[in-house]
């Protein structure tokens, strides 16, 4: 269970202070599809970023399965993001010169998993999103909907407890948007999915719960959850696990990147010489 307790967040620019979130409290079930709905500037993306550990709250607490994050170090936050959270954004953030399989495998490189196991799990994740026959394609050879499916597979390959989606259909046509939403609905059967959207129709059609934000305050919640506080233990601090890739893995990735760029440069030079 994820608990958001009286979280406040401000952004300061010179003398200007913007209240992004104001005493936001929310309890989220382990498996539900929550849509965070609201206009631009309502605080919904800030809330999503705080849940994902991409941004820090000023006050309050974020409690994950009874673990308080108040005393989290940078390393704890890194490990939390890598082991607990899967991210899906409007932009797919795929590496263009890597194959689809390699893009998904990349999410596992910091976990110390063997190459064979990475390949097996990445293949499994791509099969789960309907791309089992596209493993060796590059992003440039795929449609927008297919690339978003790759991004979802990459988010799921670590088997995270929570999947966060920020406007996942924003760059897609209506037909492809429906396919992606159906996939997210399926994913939410056995984990928590939190999606930020401007689109009330998508939220009402696919989400099991809609939380509406405006001016940094929760205005409505279609299915609030109040756990039995008598059965909950007091939140504690706990150090997270490994959050960085090995030196060998870093060098391998760098070498592959340089090799690809070198090949491109040679091909360009050759084409220019005969052109």
Feature map (PLM): residue ranges:
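H-loop (His-switch) and adjacent beta-strand-loop-beta switch element
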Residues: 210-222
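A short, surface-exposed alpha-helical micro-motif characterized by mixed small hydrophobic
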Residues: 203-205
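ABC-family P-loop ATPase nucleotide-binding domain
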Residues: 1-10, 219-249
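N-terminal Sec/SRP start-transfer signal
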Residues: 238-273
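ABC family nucleotide-binding domain
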Residues: 2-197
């Amino acid at each position: 269970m994820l608990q958001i307790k009286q979280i406040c967040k401000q952004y300061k620019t010179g003398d200007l202070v913007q209240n992004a979130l104001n005493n936001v409290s929310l309890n989220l079930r382990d498996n539900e599809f929550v849509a965070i709905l609201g206009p631009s500037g309502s605080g919904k993306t800030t809330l999503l970023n705080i849940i994902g550990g991409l941004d820090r709250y000023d006050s309050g607490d974020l409690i994950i399965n009874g673990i308080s994050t108040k005393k989290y170090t940078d390393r704890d936050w890194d490990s939390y993001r890598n082991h607990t959270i899967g991210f899906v954004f409007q932009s797919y953030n795929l590496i263009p010169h890597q194959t689809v399989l390699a893009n998904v495998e990349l999410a596992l490189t910091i976990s110390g998993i063997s190459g064979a196991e990475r390949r097996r799990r990445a293949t499994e994740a791509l099969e789960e999103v309907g791309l089992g026959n596209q493993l060796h394609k590059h992003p440039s050879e795929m449609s927008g909907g297919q690339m978003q499916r790759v991004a979802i597979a990459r988010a799921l390959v670590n088997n995270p407890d929570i999947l966060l989606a920020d406007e996942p259909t924003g760059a897609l046509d209506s037909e492809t948007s429906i396919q992606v939403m159906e996939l997210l609905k399926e994913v939410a059967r056995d984990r928590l999915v939190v999606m930020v959207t401007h689109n009330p129709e998508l939220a009402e059609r696919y989400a099991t719960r809609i939380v509406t934000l405006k001016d940094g305050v929760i205005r409505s919640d279609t299915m609030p959850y109040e756990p039995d506080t008598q059965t909950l233990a007091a939140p504690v601090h706990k150090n997270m696990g490994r959050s960085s890739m090995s030196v060998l893995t870093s060098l391998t990735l760098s070498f592959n990147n340089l090799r690809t760029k070198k090949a491109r440069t040679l091909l360009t030079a050759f084409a220019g010489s005969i052109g």
